[in-house]
Amino acid sequence: AHAIKEPLTERNICYYNKTRKRINKYWNDKKKNDKDLFIPADEENDKTQDMYIYEGLPVIAMKTKHDGDNILFANSETFNVGNIDNEYISLCCERPDENGEKEMYIYDCLIEDFRDYFLLNYCSTTHKSQGETITEEYTIYDWDGMTTKIKYTALSRAVKYENVYFGYGERE
C-alpha cells in the first residue's frame, strides 16, 4: 500500500461525506469540458453537489426506482454515463441475466430527474461500497475515522493489496 497527498486514483472510498464531495469535485473538475452539461447541487439535499455530466462519468444511485415490478435501478447501483442529448442522460452498467451472465443494461434518465437519483461516483463512502469488488487501483480516505469493521469493508473490496493507496482525508 502507498500513502499519497494528491488524488491519484479515479476509484476512491472514504468515510466522511465531506471527503466524498471533495474527491468527486477534484475529478469532475479535472475531466470536464466547457461544453459539458452542468447540473447544480440540490440545496435541499446535502448529499448532492454541482456536477458536470460527460461520457464515461461514473455515478451511483442514491435510491431505488421501480417501474411496476421491474427495478429500473437500485440504491447504490453504479453506472457510467453514455450518450447525452437535450432530454436524456443514458446510463450504462452490466447486470447478470437469468443465467448469471453479464449483459449491458441501459437506463435513460430525464435530465431534470438526474440529481434526484444520482451522485458522482469517483469516490463513495464505505457504506455505499459494501459488496463491491474493485479490480483496479483505488484510494482509501479517512482511515483514522473508521472503526475496525469499516476498515475491513474498505480494504476487502480490493482484488489485491498492491492496488490500495491511502490518502489524506479531512475530519468532519
What are these regions (language model features)?
Residues R11-E172:
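Core RecA-like ATPase module of SF1/SF2 helicases and allied nucleic-acid translocases
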